[in-house]
Amino acid sequence: MTRIAFDFALTSYCQSRCKTCPRTNNETGEPEDWLVIRHVPFSKWKKNTIGLSDNIELEYIKFCGQTGDPMMHPDITEFVNHAFTFCNNIMISTNGGLRNTDWYTEMGNKYGEELKIVFAIDGIDHETNWKYREGVDFNKAWNNMVAYCNSPGYTQWDFLVFDWNWKQIPEVARLAKEINVDEVIYKINTGPHGLLDPAKKSIVEEMICQANTI
């Protein structure tokens, strides 16, 4: 039987102004004029997913998208709950600075490791994270990630490596182990904003290799 994964973009709303995100105008920091800011209605999505798992094996369902953070959707809980009626492996990708610790704790307790939440946090402090994820409350994002780590849910920390934060890689690895993050993914930024000096790339790659052994 064919194994298929789906990535649903639920919203084009986002509180962040990431400079190389396709939704952000690099000059103004505001959403691009062409972007229609809207949420996908839950009722419409629910109707459109009827029979989705017929004759196929769903590997996973991911709520991410290109122009918005799924946690901005007011009905995100309903989307997750319904997705679990036809798939047992759900993933949410978020900047972490939305909702509160109670929400993450409750969802982790309810679904355990079958619900993976990917936290895109690019620093170990507010100042560093803000350099790319402008608009995200770092303390809130961090507390939400810690709360999810303390639940039975599966936590992934995505750390995008820029020219200004690569020296934090060892501390990221240490903190991730301290708070019981299940998995850390280090991704070297390829966009123009904060592009890593090519001369440092081999050093950074070695640091990542070392971090993955911690």
Language model segments and positions:
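N-terminal pre-triad scaffold of radical SAM enzymes
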Residues: 1-24, 59-65
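Radical SAM enzyme [4Fe-4S]-AdoMet core and its adjacent flexible, acidic
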Residues: 9, 24-43, 53-55, 60, ...
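Conserved SAM-binding loop
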Residues: 10, 70, 92
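Glycine-centered loop/turn positions within well-structured domains
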Residues: 16, 90, 126-127
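A short acidic, amphipathic alpha-helical/loop segment
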Residues: 48, 75-82, 102-107, 171-172
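Short glycine-centered, acidic/aromatic-flanked micro-motifs in structured strand/loop junctions
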Residues: 65-66, 94, 159
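Acidic-and-aromatic substrate-binding clefts and catalytic sites of carbohydrate-active enzymes
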Residues: 68-74, 97-102, 162-167, 192-196
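A short glycine-rich beta-strand->turn/loop micro-motif centered on a GG-aromatic cluster
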Residues: 91-96, 185-187
